[in-house]
Amino acid sequence: TCTVHEQLNDDTFTAGTHTGDVKSNIRVENTGTYPAYVRVRLVGRWVNGAGETVGGVPSRLPAVKLLGGWLAGSGDTYYYTTAMAPGDMTGVLCEPMVLETGTGLDGSTSYQVVEVFAEAIQAAPEEAVSAAWGVTVTDGVITAVQ
């Protein structure tokens, strides 16, 4: 198991949906009892002032500038390249993301939300990681995403 840790406008969150201007310091903690690899998927959407999803507005993500230790996969999925011991936390995923404010189809203000979904898989055996996630693991490091 794993938990996402992130900041939004310098406030720290570990779960839930939050709106704001800048999302930063996205990290994942291995909360399981075995060494594990982790990956995250970013999902963008728009909400109104009450936090309700706004329909009819195409979702998109801000530009993601990865930091060290992460590899980009398909479908806005990112892989931490090394297995983590229980209790360890990944390095920060990316540079801070600036979230947009827009206008809904009805003219109301809408706010961009980026949700971070994390997934962990037991690190041993490496072949299981490769088969389940379609990655290449070399000497304990994810070196390629297929």
Which residues are covered by each model-predicted region?
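Long, small/polar-residue-biased beta-strand-and-loop interaction regions
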Residues: 1-146
